[in-house]
Amino acid sequence: MNENEWDKLLKIHTTGRDDSNADQYRYPYEPTPYSVLERLGNSGWIRKENTLLDYGCGKGRVDFFLSYQTRCRSIGIEYNERIYAKAVENKETAISAERVDFVVVNAEQFSLPVEVARI
């Protein structure tokens, strides 16, 4: 499947690059290709009993895909409030929304939950 087909299946909108807040300290929003996520999801490294922590989650593509593919729980961390709002908006329609949470915070200030098994 291509990028748009995966987004449609997962009922999210994550395609496209966003350079609006990029500078020498912050990367632009650029979603991880689904082909990479498919390989990771099929690797067996992330399982249903795992909790995944996704630093720089953007609009939540990694979180929604891997929670769909592996049934893991996922926590997405995003510092950009505008991009975070898009992730929350995606959660309203995503098919794996019940296993995904988002937090808007600078990663340096986030306390790692004890249940997190994969980062």
Model region roles, listed by residue range:
Residues 60-64:
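Glycine-rich SAM-binding Motif I of class I
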Residues 97-107:
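Conserved SAM-binding strand-loop segment of SAM-dependent methyltransferases
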Residues 72-77:
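Short beta-strand element of Class I
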Residues 80:
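Conserved SAM/SAH-binding beta-strand->alpha-helix loop
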Residues 49-58:
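Conserved class I S-adenosyl-L-methionine
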Residues 109-114:
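Short conserved loop adjoining the S-adenosyl-L-methionine
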Residues 87-88:
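Conserved SAM-binding loop
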Residues 1-47:
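S-adenosyl-L-methionine
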